[in-house]
Amino acid sequence: MIISAASDYRAAAQRILPPFLFHYMDGGAYSEYTLRRNVEDLSEVALRQRILKNMSDLSLETTLFNEKLSMPVALGPVGLCGMYARRGEVQAAKAADAHGIPFTLSTVSVCPIEEVAPAIKRPMWFQLYVLRDRGFMRNALERAKAAGCSTLVFTVDMPTPGARYRDAHSGMSGPNAAMRRYLQAVTHPQWAWDVGLNGRPHDLGNISAYLGKPTGLEDYIGWLGNNFDPSISWKDLEWIRDFWDGPMVIKGILDPEDARDAVRFGADGIVVSNHGGRQLDGVLSSARALPAIADAVKGDIAILADSGIRNGLDVVRMIALGADTVLLGRAFLYALATAGQAGVANLLNLIEKEMKVAMTLTGAKSISEITQDSLVQGLGKELPAALAPMAKGNAA
């Protein structure tokens, strides 16, 4: 299969992966309305083409939390990467490191902190959930600090798991799930050989290290299901802020008031995110939520965004809507499942090229020049109502 665009990786991954794994990463909550809107709303953001601007000295470089990034992109936290490629977290981290951008290790990674951190030169970021087992949280933070992780991404939009109906149909959960997964695995030989056999162990490394015993997929589902904490409040985060002496980012913000609370709390950054449409179906897409949040806190806190970003044009759109940097999720996982480290490296090259084209044709020589003035209404379709204020005065 020829890979000429970032979107090609999704189709390639679907051919390689057992259905339970493909649909686990590809699916969302309930009827998947928000999952669809994440992509569709972002694609409806029209860019403003400008010409004859002498774009010979264009640069994608930016700085975030005193880290230099080759472009305003980081690989976001995605669980179970090691089920999609052999030691997947290590491969993805190496690709990000080579490209000069951060990699974020998920709490529920297959490869533990101690395996991933030494594999790269750049300090990685670490993502942590709010869990009932505070002992695990403290243990994970201590290990992340010891491994030299620079930034903590604290995910707060998961006090309870979302209802993901597609998982029951695909075999990730539901009746006879283990047998269904086995049958799917043996009928997908490329994955079975490369990952299923040679990618072992398939423990959840960070959890296994704490529990002191191997943890497989069933353990992962059961342990997490029993450990999400619906009682969490801002007050519960205070000990983490005191313990962690590096930048702390609150992930899962969709409302301007929550963004203001993050500023008052003393967070260094927020991620405007609906968990990729995997938690509460029917909430705003990140693209719709971002402008109002940027209007409320831009300049007071670093604004990151995820959910729906599939290519370099989407990165430019998110920045024009108010983000400082974006996180990739499914986009890099599709590439990882298709071709491992080389796939992620190629995806990042594609995104960089697409960003350069978009910036050249919108007259933005640097990331700081991508603003609301880079957006335009019209071209046969108005921007969604929640996005229109960002393009005020730019009607074509």
UniProtKB/Swiss-Prot annotation:
Cell compartment(s), UniProt: Cell inner membrane
Binding-site list for substrate: Y24, Y129, R164, R278
Entries under InterPro entries matching the protein: Aldolase_TIM (IPR013785), Alpha-hydoxy_acid_DH_FMN (IPR012133), FMN-dep_DH (IPR000262), FMN_HAD (IPR037396), FMN_hydac_DH_AS (IPR008259), LldD (IPR020920)
EC number of the protein: 1.1.-.-
Topology within the bilayer: Peripheral membrane protein
Occurrences of domain FMN hydroxy acid dehydrogenase (ranges): 1-380
Gene Ontology CC: one annotated term: plasma membrane
Active site: H275
Keywords recorded for this protein, A-Z: Cell inner membrane, Cell membrane, Flavoprotein, FMN, Membrane, Oxidoreductase
NCBIfam families on file: L_lactate_LldD, PRK11197.1
Family the UniProt entry places it in: Belongs to the FMN-dependent alpha-hydroxy acid dehydrogenase family.
Protein name per UniProt: L-lactate dehydrogenase
Biological source species: Escherichia coli O6:H1 (strain CFT073 / ATCC 700928 / UPEC)
